[in-house]
Each structure stands twice: as C-alpha cells, then as structure tokens.
C-alpha cells in the first residue's frame, strides 16, 4: 500500500486487488470502514478504480466474499485428495499468514445476523466450504456424508475463531490433530460397516 496510486492494473487483476484490499480494510476497520476511497487507497489504486469495477459498495463486499472464499478453500487444501492427515493441516499456517481473511469472514457472518441481505452470500460461502469438505471426506472413504461435512467444517470454523482470539498456534495444531484422529476413528468404524449416525 502506498500513498500514491500506481499505474493502471489490468481489469481482472485490479478487481482481485480491490477484493484483497477490502478484506484488509474490514479486518482493520470493520464493515463501517469500507468505502470506495478506503479500498482503492489500500489497493494502491485511484479512487475511481473501485467505483469503475463495482457499481455499489454491497457489490464490492459480495465480490470480496467470493474471492476470499475461493482463496481460503484453495490455500487450505480443505478439498485435499482424501488424505485425512492433510485435511485442515494447513489451518495453523493459514491463520498465521492470512488472519485478515478469517477476520473478514467472521465480520460478515456477524453482520449478516443484523443485515439479512448479507445472509444469502454467507450461506453460499459456507456451503462452498462444506461442499469442499464433503468431497474430501468422500475421497477418504466416508461416502457422501453431508452431515459429517457440516460437523467437520464447524470444527474447523471454530478452531479458526479460537485462533483469532488466543493467537495460540500450538493449540490450533493440537485441535487439527484431534479432529484428524477423530476422523480416523470414524473412518475405521465406517470401514467395519458401522453407521455414524
């Protein structure tokens, strides 16, 4: 971030930079801090860049939510190749490297309780995460188990919140290992023909 806007970025790249900047603005100042001007300044772009790429503030927030969700799913390897050891293994590092994305997401979750117009976007974002977990668990041998995917995602989401509060990487790592151990036990039960519910 600089004080002077830099040269014009390509259209797709500028939108991504604005989304990433919006995430940082929300992490630092909350949703009330989001304006075309604040986001453009954070991105190092001219004020007009934000209004050019996004018709409204809400559209800019919605696009940033989609961007952050895609980035988090890719970076977290949550839809890994079915290896339970890999499931959420990167969470402690991600929370260290990208705490702003988690802060942004949780800020929007809380705001959606007060602002119903955000709720459908939050639900869609959560569904994307749950679906990625569901696919990963299916590859691991659990079959198509949406209920288990919801519980696993809720656990990862909770570990993320706790990491933001306590800033204790070791505790987050232990939480991930415990989740993986519980999933191994559950998979053993499934392989023996037992039902999880």
PLM features per residue range, with description:
Residues 1-13, 191-197:
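N-terminal intrinsically disordered/low-complexity leader segments
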Residues 14-17, 21-59, 63:
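Helix-turn-helix
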Residues 17, 21-29, 75, 104, ...:
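Solvent-exposed, amphipathic alpha-helical segments
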Residues 63, 74-102, 149-152, 176:
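Hydrophobic alpha-helical connector segments
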Residues 66-71:
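Short, basic, alpha-helical segments at the C-terminal edge of helix-turn-helix-like DNA-binding modules
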Residues 96-126:
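Amphipathic alpha-helical segments used for helix-helix packing
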Residues 118-119, 123, 138-197:
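Hydrophobic/aromatic-rich alpha-helical bundle segments in the mid-to-C-terminal region
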């Amino acid at each position: 971030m600089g004080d002077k806007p830099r040269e014009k970025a390509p259209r797709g790249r500028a939108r991504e930079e604005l989304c990433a900047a919006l995430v940082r603005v929300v992490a630092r100042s909350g949703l009330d801090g989001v304006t075309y001007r604040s986001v453009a300044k954070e991105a190092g772009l001219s004020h007009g860049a934000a209004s050019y790429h996004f018709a409204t503030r809400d559209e800019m927030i919605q696009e940033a939510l989609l961007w952050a969700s895609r980035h988090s799913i890719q970076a977290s390897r949550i839809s890994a190749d079915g290896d339970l050891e890999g499931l959420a293994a990167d969470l402690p590092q991600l929370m260290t490297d990208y705490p702003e994305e988690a802060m942004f997401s949780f800020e929007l979750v809380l705001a959606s309780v007060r602002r119903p117009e955000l709720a459908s976007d939050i639900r869609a974002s959560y569904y994307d995460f749950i679906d990625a977990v569901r696919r990963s668990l299916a590859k691991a041998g659990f079959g198509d188990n949406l209920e288990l995917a919801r519980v696993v995602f809720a656990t990862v989401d909770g570990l993320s919140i706790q990491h933001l509060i306590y800033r204790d990487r070791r505790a987050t790592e232990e939480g991930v290992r415990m989740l993986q151990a519980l999933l191994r036990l559950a998979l053993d039960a499934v392989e023996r023909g037992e039902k999880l519910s």
